[in-house]
């Protein structure tokens, strides 16, 4: 039975092949393969000679790869995922690839801003002259939204500006730029006595990112039980390689003063996370209070991360690729900025009867400088 079927199949295939070869005008042709459109490099001005670079291709669905050191990009080069800051002398090269197409030609552009070290090159000063509470700049900030964030057992619902989803109230936003010139990130309890909480988590993902330099934010933090403010960064490539491979840089994390881990003193923490790579060092000088205004910053150079409070010379934590176990992800590409105020979670614990609502995280500015 099987042999007979095989013989019949062979006969049929022979017929197909013979038919396919017959006739001069009836034969098939191999489709001509097209080339993906070369990337377009566009720039917008940042500050003091720095620019924000974005890449695009006219080929629908194209994936873009780029380098900044003048080397020829390939599919193993960093994938372009968001606009990035250029504040140093670089040669950006990019290609586009798309299914069914050959790779594009290389697009190249050199940047020679020659900006001195310590120069302010990007910032959000949260200025507001409208006379009313205003939306955080939508060209800079977007939002994570919803519940059960991040695997931390947090309790809040994160709300975007203008959202009426779930417990969110657009008339009482959780993130706004006040007439006082500060960004307000507000944790609220819409109905007193319930375990329903709202807050905000702002991010520059897809809008702004940078690699290397110094970033700092001047902030005043809430101290109530269950509050968990943070100022941090994640790799642009989180969507393609996930966390923790993308890398996480925690410029600041703080939990309530009553937590047993605090051992009677107030503190903030600067951390790094990657694949099999973790580090966290606390800053707790005498009489330090996170409820007062302080500037929290990070100095990012190749192979090294440093954290400081109030002055770049006041470094309290240093992490290096040469001394840490695991995979160091912080030389692999740009990262985007996040600021949020979590409620509850595995680290701070839940709010209790002493917790003050609303609790507010105030941000005076976020600034990026050259090293």
Where does each model-flagged region fall?
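Bacterial N-terminal signal peptides that target proteins for export
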Residues: 1-11
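C-terminal motif of bacterial Sec signal peptides marking the signal peptidase cleavage site
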Residues: 17-20
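Bacterial signal peptide processing site
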Residues: 22-25
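Short, compositionally stereotyped local motifs that mark structural "simplifiers"
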Residues: 28-116
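GH16 jelly-roll
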Residues: 42-44, 48-52, 56, 78-81, ...
């Amino acid at each position: 039975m099987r042999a007979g079927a095989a013989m019949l199949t062979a006969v049929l295939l022979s017929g197909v092949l013979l038919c396919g070869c017959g006739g001069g005008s009836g034969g098939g042709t191999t489709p001509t393969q097209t080339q993906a459109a070369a990337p377009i490099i566009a720039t917008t001005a940042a500050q003091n000679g720095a620019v924000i670079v974005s890449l695009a291709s006219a080929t629908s669905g194209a994936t873009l790869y780029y380098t900044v050191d003048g080397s020829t990009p390939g599919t193993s080069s960093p994938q372009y995922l968001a606009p990035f800051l250029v504040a140093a002398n670089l040669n950006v090269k990019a290609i586009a690839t798309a299914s069914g197409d050959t790779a594009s030609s290389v697009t190249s552009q050199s940047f020679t801003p020659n900006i001195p070290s310590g120069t302010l090159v990007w910032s959000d000063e949260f200025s507001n002259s409208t006379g009313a509470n205003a939306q955080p700049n939508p060209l800079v900030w977007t939002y994570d939204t919803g519940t059960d964030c991040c695997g931390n057992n947090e309790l809040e619902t994160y709300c975007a500006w203008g959202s009426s989803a779930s417990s969110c109230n657009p008339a009482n936003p959780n993130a706004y730029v006040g007439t006082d010139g500060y960004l307000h990130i507000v944790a609220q309890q819409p109905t007193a006595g319930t375990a329903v909480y709202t807050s905000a988590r702002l991010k520059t993902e897809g809008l702004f990112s940078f690699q290397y330099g110094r970033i700092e934010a001047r902030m005043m933090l809430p101290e109530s039980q269950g509050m968990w403010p943070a100022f941090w960064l994640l790799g642009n490539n989180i969507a393609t390689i996930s966390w923790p491979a993308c890398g996480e840089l925690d410029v600041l994390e703080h939990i309530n003063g009553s937590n047993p881990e605090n051992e009677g003193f107030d503190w903030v923490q600067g951390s790094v996370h990657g694949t099999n790579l973790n580090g966290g060092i606390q800053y707790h000088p005498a009489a330090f209070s996170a409820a007062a205004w302080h500037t929290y910053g990070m100095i990012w150079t190749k192979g090294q991360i440093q954290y400081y409070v109030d002055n770049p010379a006041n470094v309290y934590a240093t992490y290096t690729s040469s001394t840490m176990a695991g995979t160091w992800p912080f030389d692999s590409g740009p990262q985007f900025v996040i600021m949020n105020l979590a409620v509850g979670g595995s680290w701070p614990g839940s709010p209790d009867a002493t917790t003050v609502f609303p609790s507010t995280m105030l941000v005076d500015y976020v600034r990026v400088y050259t090293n």
